[in-house]
């Protein structure tokens, strides 16, 4: 997860898994929220029995998969990460499950999981990606934790987002920018917009902030 920071020569805390994990500047875990490995196994058994599709497990900085298909290969290319063989021995907490499948399958799985399981946050990060986390996980909680730890006022913070799991963060920070390529509901909920990801919207917004 930290290779982006390494490439940019940035040494700073990093929030991952929609706020489920925070690593400090030395890659040490300082904040962690997830569900039990028992819950992860229940979810895994259900998904495999009814849908027979690959399931990704995220545990701290490990990405583990039970099998590799085209979707997993594409995710590996996008992230620059190499998946590990699934091994839950010694694991006590899972930060996230990810299912990559056809949009119709993802829709049906999302509905069935929400009916069958409680205490979880289940959402589509895109049409073919279904993410499953503990219901306590949020980006706003992670930001609040970091601000308290670093003694930074929320009015001094800036955030950028394009999807529904960004909304709580965008509403919490001093300035929250919705990316032009964001989901319609995000654009309607957040009054301040910037250019799209492809148009370097983050840089554009920061340049304007510096000029204020």
Task: Give the residues covered by each predicted segment.
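Hydrophobic/aromatic beta-strand patches that form the interior of the parallel beta-sheet core
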Residues: 15, 158-160, 177, 194
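Active-site phosphate-binding/coordination module
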Residues: 1-71
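A general structural signal for well-ordered alpha-helical segments in protein cores
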Residues: 1, 40, 94, 106, ...
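Asp-based, Mg2+/Mn2+-dependent phosphohydrolase catalytic module
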Residues: 172, 176-212
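Hydrophobic packing residues within well-ordered alpha-helices of enzyme cores
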Residues: 1-5, 109, 113, 170-173, ...
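Conserved acidic, metal-coordinating active-site core of Asp-based
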Residues: 46, 50-160, 164-169, 181
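Short, structured coil segments at secondary-structure junctions
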Residues: 8-10, 18, 116-118, 172-173, ...
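Predominant activation on well-ordered alpha-helical scaffold segments within soluble catalytic domains
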Residues: 2, 44, 144, 187, ...
């Amino acid at each position: 997860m930290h290779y982006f920071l390494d490439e940019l020569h940035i040494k700073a805390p990093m929030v991952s898994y929609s706020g489920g994990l925070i690593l400090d500047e030395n890659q040490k875990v300082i904040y962690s929220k997830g569900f039990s490995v028992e819950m992860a196994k229940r979810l895994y058994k259900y998904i495999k029995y009814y849908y027979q599709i690959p399931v990704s497990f995220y545990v701290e900085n490990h990405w583990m998969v039970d099998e590799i298909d085209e979707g997993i290969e594409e995710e590996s290319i996008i992230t620059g990460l190499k998946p590990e063989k699934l091994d839950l021995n010694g694991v006590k907490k899972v930060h996230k499950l990810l299912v990559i499948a056809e949009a119709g399958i993802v829709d049906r799985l999302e509905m069935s999981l929400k009916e069958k399981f409680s205490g979880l946050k289940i959402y589509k990060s895109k049409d073919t990606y279904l993410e499953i986390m503990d219901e306590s996980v949020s980006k706003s909680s992670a930001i609040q934790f970091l601000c308290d730890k670093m003694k930074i006022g929320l009015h001094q913070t800036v955030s950028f987002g394009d999807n529904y799991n960004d909304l709580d963060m965008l509403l919490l920070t001093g300035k929250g920018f919705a990316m032009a390529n964001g989901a319609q509901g995000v654009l309607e909920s957040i009054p301040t917009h910037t250019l799209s990801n492809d148009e370097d919207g983050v840089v554009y917004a920061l340049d304007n902030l510096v000029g204020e």
